[in-house]
From Swiss-Prot:
GO terms for biological process: ATP synthesis coupled electron transport; electron transport coupled proton transport. It is a multi-pass membrane protein. The gene is ndhD. HAMAP family: NDH1_NuoM. This is NAD(P)H-quinone oxidoreductase chain 4, chloroplastic. Belongs to the complex I subunit 4 family. Pfam families: Proton_antipo_M.
């Protein structure tokens, strides 16, 4: 038990500081923006400080743990703690949210509410990644939906209300399965219900019940991740949302599904997971091919990037399904890597939209001459997305490949088949990403338009792009920095399985 409540402060600070902004007299949009950025930076520094001085890398157990009785009537605890699995996602959340608040500078309409919702989302996400109680996990999962829905429905394109409604129907509908799973796990087999994740990890269930619980959790996480066929909310949502919201969705929201899949399905229900893992491998492989072949048909720039996200999530699913040390490590690395790459691509798509006010690729062309800095950054980050060696995506996908090859669970022929199909998906990825760059930046279409002139990226946008690019290159050159955080935790999760 830790003496100082670091995690409670880290979880509660953004939303309380954001609430303060709503009650203070209105001082203009600029004050709100700088206030939000200061809160985000302070929170990120606080998180980094707490983890640097209190987190021991070689300890797979829960650290910085806090356990307070919250509601006596329900026997409900406020349990927080971190381990190697959650530390990376919490730091990613802090980093991406700080940059997203900086990216939201052009938002002027109702900016106080916009920035408050971003901070509320920040609290919900960190609360989810650090919760050690199943009911608290569910509450954070639900709380996080409210600011996302409001951000989607109030700021964005013409069809924003449609996409926000679709998002809430999918996610809230799938949350019913999550709630049933939480209640099923907590009420089974003990005189008094337990929701403590550490105790639940050592509990065993009858095979039928474990399979039913697994399916319930899988549906909830499959919508967030997203796994096909539950992915259709994602392109619509990304196509309409403001790009700073897109950064949070692609960078953090999708990772919540992957985190839940490892934290609950893999850790609490190992027997069911080993039964379902071949199906996860098949679905992950289909997802890579399906999204990569659907993406070139998208006219909307942000929808095309959204489909690339769906394709990259396939590697995470395959890594989780392989039940091997490299496979799971690769999946965790891909979670972090795609968090940076996805957020960066949406940011650059948004900045180019701010200048030309065109969202469709067939209306663009010839932008490279006018905006060379954005063109350069977009090209580099497209290369990162197609897993260029030296970038984080390459290392993550390579380690997932090793995970499949070293897996004891699958026959050689099925391994070869999965790798062959994945390779086709990886060949399709450069095709849609490079054709996207070609349609946007090359040719003469926009140069022939009268009064054609717009500014290249300013210092704020350049700082933002470089800030996201540095960790992508850093992880690509030295992936051990991320892998060492989770390696002990991965080993302790895999010790529940009989092979690998």
């Amino acid at each position: 038990m830790n003496d100082f409540p670091w995690l409670t402060i880290i979880v509660v600070f953004p939303i309380s500081a954001g609430s303060l902004m709503l009650f203070l007299p209105h001082r203009g949009n600029k004050v709100n923006k700088w206030y939000t950025i200061c809160i985000s930076i302070l929170e990120l520094l606080l998180t980094t400080y707490a983890f640097c001085y209190n987190f021991k890398m070689d300890d797979p157990l829960i650290q910085l743990s806090e356990d307070y009785k919250w509601i006596n009537f329900f026997d409900f605890y406020w349990r927080l703690g971190i381990d190697g699995l959650s530390i990376g996602t919490i730091l990613l959340t802090g980093f991406i949210t700080t940059l997203a608040t900086l990216a939201a500078f052009p938002v002027t309409r109702n900016s106080r509410l916009f920035h408050f919702l971003m901070l509320a989302m920040y609290s919900g996400q960190i609360g989810l990644f650090s919760s050690r109680d199943l009911l608290l996990f569910f509450i954070m999962w639900e709380l996080e939906l409210i600011p996302v829905y409001l951000l989607l429905s109030m700021w964005g394109g013409k069809k924003r209300l449609y996409s926000a409604t679709k998002f809430i129907l999918y996610t809230a509908g799938s949350s019913i399965f999550l709630l049933i799973g939480v209640l099923g796990i907590s009420l089974y087999g003990s005189n008094e219900p337990t929701l403590n994740l550490e105790l639940l990890a050592n509990q065993s269930y009858p095979v039928t019940l474990e399979i039913l619980l697994y399916i319930g959790f899988l549906i909830a996480f499959a919508v967030k991740l997203p796994i096909i066929p539950f992915h259709t909310w994602l392109p619509d949502t990304h196509g309409e949302a403001h790009y700073s919201t897109c950064m949070l969705l692609a960078g953090i929201l999708l990772k919540m599904g992957a985190y839940g899949l490892v934290r609950i399905n893999m850790e609490l229900l190992p027997h069911a997971h080993s039964m379902f893992s071949p199906w996860l491998m098949v679905v992950g492989t289909i997802q890579i091919i399906y999204a990569a072949s659907t993406s070139p048909g998208q006219r909307n720039l942000k929808k095309r990037i959204a489909y690339s996200s769906v394709s990259h999530m396939g590697f995470i699913i395959i890594g989780i399904g392989s039940i091997t040390d490299p496979g799971l490590n690769g999946a965790i690395l891909q979670i972090i890597s795609h968090g940076f790459i996805g957020a960066a691509l949406f940011f650059l798509a948004g900045t180019s939209y701010d200048r030309i006010r065109l969202g469709y690729l067939d209306e663009m062309g010839g932008m490279a001459i006018s905006i060379p800095k954005i063109f350069t950054m977009f090209t580099i980050l497209s290369m990162a997305s197609l897993a260029l060696p030296g970038m984080s995506g390459f290392v993550a996908e390579l380690i997932v490949f090793f995970g499949i090859i070293t897996s004891q669970k699958y026959f050689l022929i099925s391994k070869i088949l999965i790798i062959f199909v994945m390779a086709i998906g990886m060949i399709l990825t450069p095709i849609y990403l490079l054709s996207m760059s070609r349609q946007m930046f090359y040719g003469y279409k926009l140069i022939n338009v009268k009064n054609f002139s717009f500014f290249d990226s300013g210092p704020r946008e350049l700082f933002l792009s470089i800030s996201i690019l540095l960790p992508i290159i850093g992880i690509g050159i030295y992936p051990d920095f991320v892998l060492s955080l989770a390696s002990d935790k991965v080993e302790s999760i895999l010790s529940n399985y009989f092979y690998g």
